[in-house]
Amino acid sequence: MTIKPSFEPVDAGPHTSLPVTNAAMDRNLGVGSIAFMALAGAAPLGAVIAAFPIVISVSQSPAIPLFFVLATAILAVFTVGFTRMARYVANAGAFYSYIQAGLGRITGSGAATFAVGTYVMLMLALAAYIGVATSDAITHFGGPATPWFLWTAGWILITAVLGYRDIELSAKVLGIVLVVEILVVVIIDVAILARGGAEGVTASSLNPGLLTEGFPSLGLMFAFFSFVGFEATAVFRNEARDPERTIPRATYLAVVGVGLFYAFSAWAITVGVGTDKIVGAATDDPTGMVLGLALTFVSPVMQDVMQVLLLSSVFACILTFHNVLTRYFFTMGGKGILPAALGVVSTKHRAPSRASLTVSLVTGVLLIGVLLAGLDPIAEVYTWLSGAATLGVIVLMVLTSLAVLVFFGKRSDVSLGMWSTKIAPGLALASLGVVVWLVIKNFSALVPSPVVANVLLVVLAATFLVGVVVALVFRATRPDAYLALDA
């Protein structure tokens, strides 16, 4: 039974005294399109090839399927309150819009700039990774050695073209890529199980007792990293056909779909390598472990196909986060946190094209800075920034859970039940709070350099403070703009 809201959805759009958009974005995205973009943001093939070995090696445990089961359970509980808020906050800002609705303008403004900083870090990390991966793929197939940054520039250009246009085009591209990715991984999973794996098909990696071995907190932490991107569903609210139904369904599909896919594939991979051998294999050859399974259980051609698809997987992830950042810039431009020109919809493409172009320019400029600084694209840029971004996303989820509790706690006229407004958000707040504590405690495992680790933590904190300062300045000097921040 669908429960109708007993009060009007919060309009988090621009205040009438601020510049407004000159066109509306088309509402042409259904459950499948939005879920595809969120699933692609999680980069399933990239996670299986690149993240799975890291989960195993840092945790020193073969219990990787259990890590993903736990992460899925926590995120599923979080999704209950997250999607409930989507019915009442008519805004494309997702995390920050919900935080603002529950915790106020100042905290919400801080969350907005914090989210932008987090996703910019993700974009930079992935852009550096795909450049190196492309260069490596070319040499693997007999081509010449080429600079990674040239390929990164090319991928950014493609992203800029797709992101500039109607988002339905991006959704179609991501949908095709995602289907192929999942199909390839499923083929390998089935081949491993059909051929009996390394030591026979067993459920030994599903033994709960393994959670007491090694460093399970690190395994859970990196499992969460593999889910980053699922939250993209709510960002596309303004382009969904029926957001009150589409957003919740797409979010649950993304979380449960990714979780089951990861858990099953993780189990199959432990069967393929062997429960007793997989920690050593992941530690000794993290980049080649899964590709080696494709060679052993399927064919050399499949191994080559996976190397190519790794590029499309990471690109799909980049395109998703580009679209997420674009919607953040668009919403923040409409509110006056960023220049108002970013809050304008293109009359030609019916998309926030100016915001999209700005995201591309910011990414390009920061990557030039990376080149000038002489940072290693994988060991430093990818590793450091992906680690910091993981922490940032989980912090946003903690604040969102708290905001859900406060938002519905203030409204006695909302009859949505204890589970969706209090119990589930409370459980999510507690469990995600523990995860944040574990991430900070083990941050040195993500960023080995203590100095760099502290710098990244300070940068994250600074991005939050920027938004807080903007809100305080608005309150003191521009009351109309401050009121426009109200969710």
Can you describe what each PLM-predicted range is?
Residues 51, 388-393, 419-487:
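A generic transmembrane alpha-helix motif of multi-pass inner-membrane proteins
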Residues 51, 76-156, 161, 314, ...:
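Hydrophobic transmembrane alpha-helices that form the core helical bundles
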